[in-house]
């Protein structure tokens, strides 16, 4: 009987210790899981990067609070930028050619620090990544060319000649073609990305600047700065199939993820034209602040962020109501563009 009581006691003690160890393991695993989820949540958080031309920096905006949470120094006169498809890097063009910039700053989005600087051509402006993230195309406005950067080595591997004073660049979703606006020749160069050569030239309006391609790849929307219009190019035929009148001096275009609406900042009339892409008509005009230049849509399509160059602010537009619901202050001098992760 005594032996049995001892065995029972040892059994209970052993079970209690095992339960404690098990509980400790579960607690540790829970903490690790919460930490991992916190990291994933931080990485997945929607953030806007705003190059500020006169401050030689990039403001980082938390889109949940619409406040500036960081400022990243870059080189002279940053003008535009693009987010890598995996969301890990932002490429920012530094256009201060007079001061010897002519470069691209590579920002790590986890640390919000510049991890590389890539020399490119004279007066780099527009930049875009291929959909697979393998290459970035940088438009060199004073060199009438496009620098092709291998994103793995962060080096220029090719240079493509285009029209005069090129500005913007956008890819078809399959990555087969890049569309580049040429301001001085009033046209768009179509680049075959396999051969890295121009295969078509599409006449558009006067002084084309920014552009984007619809999510289905069927059309390219081109902002014509001096024509106060947007040219709609069929990517199947590389011809203009529609021209949409907008506000004064439109500068760029962003399209919602569902492809239903195009948002066009008009820096001469201090507003944003909203185009219904099914009818190619303006269905709303949204007043913002002085000299709107850049625009980007959040991944869920709920908001458009518009940089106001002279006001030194960013207007936050609710795309459901097409009204300004917030204004981001403190983004420094001359915000030129918006890039959203």
Which residues does each PLM region occupy?
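N-terminal secretory signal peptides that target proteins for export/translocation
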Residues: 1-23
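Intrinsic disorder/low-complexity segments in short proteins, especially the signal peptide
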Residues: 6, 28, 39-42
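Sec-dependent N-terminal signal peptides
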Residues: 19-34
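Predominantly soluble domains enriched in secretory-pathway, periplasmic, or organellar proteins
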Residues: 33, 37-341
């Amino acid at each position: 009987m005594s032996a049995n009581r001892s065995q029972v006691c040892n059994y209970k003690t052993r079970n209690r210790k095992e339960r404690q160890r098990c509980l400790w393991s579960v607690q540790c695993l829970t903490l690790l899981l919460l930490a991992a989820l916190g990291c994933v949540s931080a990485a997945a958080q929607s953030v806007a990067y705003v190059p500020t031309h006169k401050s030689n920096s990039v403001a980082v905006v938390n889109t949940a609070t619409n406040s500036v949470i960081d400022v990243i120094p870059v080189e002279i006169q940053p003008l535009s930028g693009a987010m890598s498809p995996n969301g890990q890097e932002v490429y920012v063009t530094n256009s201060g050619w007079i001061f010897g910039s002519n470069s691209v700053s590579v920002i790590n989005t986890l640390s919000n620090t510049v991890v590389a600087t890539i020399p490119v051509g004279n007066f780099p402006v527009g930049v875009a990544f291929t959909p697979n993230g393998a290459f970035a195309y940088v438009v060199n406005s004073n060199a009438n060319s496009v620098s092709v950067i291998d994103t793995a080595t962060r080096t220029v591997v090719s240079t493509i000649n285009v029209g005069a004073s090129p500005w913007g660049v956008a890819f078809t979703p399959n990555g087969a073609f890049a569309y580049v606006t040429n301001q001085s020749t009033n046209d768009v160069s179509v680049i075959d990305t396999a051969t890295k050569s121009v295969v078509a030239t599409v006449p558009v309006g006067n002084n084309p600047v920014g552009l984007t391609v619809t999510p289905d790849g069927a059309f390219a929307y081109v902002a014509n700065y001096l024509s106060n219009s947007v040219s709609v190019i069929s990517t199947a035929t590389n011809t203009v199939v529609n021209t949409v009148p907008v506000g004064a001096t439109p500068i760029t275009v962003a399209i919602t993820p569902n492809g239903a609406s195009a948002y066009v900042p008009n820096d001469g009339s201090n507003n944003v034209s909203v185009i219904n892409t099914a009818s190619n008509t303006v269905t709303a005009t949204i007043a913002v602040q002085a000299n709107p230049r850049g625009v980007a849509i959040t991944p869920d399509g709920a908001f458009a962020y518009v940089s106001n160059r002279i006001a030194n602010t960013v207007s936050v537009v609710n795309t459901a109501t097409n009204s300004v619901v917030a204004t981001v202050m403190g983004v420094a001098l001359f915000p030129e563009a918006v890039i959203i992760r």
